[in-house]
């Protein structure tokens, strides 16, 4: 059976960043605990799951505080080309777009995500020069305990 490739393109949730108690704390979950790795184990050996998570990544926004390198749109095409052929791209972005400094509504953020989807659909980074399929994911509610 041919291997299939899933690209997980996201922010700190995809990266596996542990919730920070202080701005200087930068811990990461063990690779086996990160959601792309868990998904890869569940899918089985015929799937290659690639985690492309970057803490603070926005959908399409240059961050005036953290830098323009946090803009997911700027990084997307190079990452798609790096991992071709891709069967499925999972987008898990938008959380950092909620920062007060951006002043975006949920509708605004959905339009930002749409720009990423269109960029993927217009790419030739899937099988046989086609576009990969796209799945939009959102993190579940997190309840902090302890």
State where each predicted segment sits.
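A general secondary-structure junction signal
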Residues: 53-56, 136-138
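Alpha-helical cap/lid subdomain in secreted, periplasmic
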Residues: 1-2, 33, 45, 69-146
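Serine-esterase "nucleophile elbow" of acetyl-processing enzymes
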Residues: 1-54, 60, 78-81, 89
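Short acidic/His/Gly/Ser-rich catalytic and metal-binding motifs that mark active-site loops
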Residues: 15-18, 58-61, 98-100, 143-146
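Short glycine-enriched, charge-decorated loop/helix-capping segments at active-site entrances
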Residues: 21-28, 64-68, 104-107
């Amino acid at each position: 059976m041919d291997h299939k490739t899933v690209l997980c393109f996201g922010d700190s949730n995809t990266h596996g960043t542990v919730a920070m108690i202080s701005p200087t704390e930068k811990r990461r979950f063990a690779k086996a605990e990160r959601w792309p790795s868990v998904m890869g184990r569940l899918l089985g050996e015929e799937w290659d799951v690639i985690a492309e998570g970057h803490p603070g990544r926005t959908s399409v926004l240059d961050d005036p505080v953290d830098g323009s390198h946090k803009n997911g749109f700027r990084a997307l095409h190079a990452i798609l080309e790096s991992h071709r052929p891709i069967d499925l791209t999972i987008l898990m972005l938008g959380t950092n777009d909620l920062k007060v400094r951006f002043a975006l509504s949920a509708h605004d953020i959905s339009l930002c995500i749409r720009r990423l989807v269109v960029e993927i659909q217009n790419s030739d980074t899937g099988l046989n020069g086609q576009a990969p399929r796209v799945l939009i994911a959102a993190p579940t509610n997190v309840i902090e305990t302890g």
